[in-house]
Amino acid sequence: MKNLFLFCRAGFEKECAAEIQQRAGELNVGGFVKANNNDAYVVYQCFEDDAADTLVKQLPLDSLIFARQMFAASDLLVDLPENDRISPIVAALSDVSKAGEVRVETPDTNEAKELSAFCRKFTVPLRQHLKKSGSLLAQENPKRPIIHVCFIGPGRAYVGYSYSNNSSPHFMGIPRLKMAADAPSRSSLKLDEAFGQFVPKEEQEERIRSGMNAVDLGACPGGWTYQLVRRGMFVSAVDNGPMDEKLMETGQVKHYREDGFRFEPQRKNIYWLVCDMVEKPARVAELIEAWAINGWFKEAIFNLKLPMKSRYKEVTAILETMQTILKENGVTDFKVQCKHLYHDRDEVTVHLWLRPNTAWN
């Protein structure tokens, strides 16, 4: 297969396209991008047959900012007959052997999601035929490749596969999170999703645990503080605005009515620093850099608001500058990740982990 199909948020196709063009080039996989505004997906067509397999194997999905999910894909299947859509799809997947799962998906647009009921019904007979052809195992296996069938319209679909060790576990790359009734704001879901994105399940008990100390800069009214409190942490909430009363009643939150850019923690045993402030992204990055250089936290999650234009260029420039400044100031052991989360809008979420291979005291 010579295409790489990438899911993204509608309206961010240009950013996703610019990113995959650059990252594929770094792996010497030549090709060109096919993308339309508000389609919520991008297709990177490789010049060489089977080159998409190189990308789904060697390009970590977690290293891509704007892609939610990706898979090696066939050319677009068009005019699938209503009386037999299955046969052309099974034929297009003839080179896929013993996959462990099949997902029938759509891009994340209102128009495409009108097909979601059809996709659910279609999955059952398709699964049976794929098992008969040998493309799909009789029993689901999370360690085997995943077959993707993405309908972009009636009778039009891209089909292909991803590898389970380099693929989102979520349908369409979208985690299904529920808004808690007592959460102070919808922004709470951003941090909830970020923890799932940046901290593997098997490490969450160690890295996101009860009793930890955390700081929330720009905390009002407490959407992000809520997620920290829910996990049993003690939080210094920094904001000139008011905090949610129920959060304050937990006894786990101390409210500092201060400017987050001027706040200095009294205690230096902080594990988590979180920050979601409506501010210029470069200024927020500088704030996090200062905290990192001072060694005031172990892990940080923060949002960077995106400009209207050149969003990919701006984000990558800020992240590169951050890494340079940290290294120039003696902070050399760290890991940075960045993702345009499902619950993000015109922003991206960044995770900075200091001394990732050194245990927290």
Curated annotation (Swiss-Prot):
Catalyzes the 2'-O-methylation at nucleotide C2498 in 23S rRNA. The active site is at K305 (proton acceptor). Monomer. It catalyses: cytidine(2498) in 23S rRNA + S-adenosyl-L-methionine = 2'-O-methylcytidine(2498) in 23S rRNA + S-adenosyl-L-homocysteine + H(+). Its EC number is 2.1.1.186. Belongs to the class I-like SAM-binding methyltransferase superfamily. RNA methyltransferase RlmE family. RlmM subfamily. Keywords: Cytoplasm, Methyltransferase, rRNA processing, S-adenosyl-L-methionine, Transferase. GO terms for molecular function: S-adenosylmethionine-dependent methyltransferase activity. It holds the Pfam family RlmM_FDX. It comes from Shewanella sp. (strain W3-18-1). The gene is rlmM. It comes from the Bacteria. It is found in: Cytoplasm. GO terms for cellular component: cytoplasm. GO terms for biological process: methylation; rRNA processing. InterPro entries: RlmM_FDX, RlmM_THUMP-like, RNA_MeTrfase_FtsJ_dom, rRNA_MeTrfase_M, SAM-dependent_MTases_sf. NCBIfam families: PRK11760.1. S-adenosyl-L-methionine binds at S187, C220, P221, G222, G223, D239, D259, D276. This is Ribosomal RNA large subunit methyltransferase M.
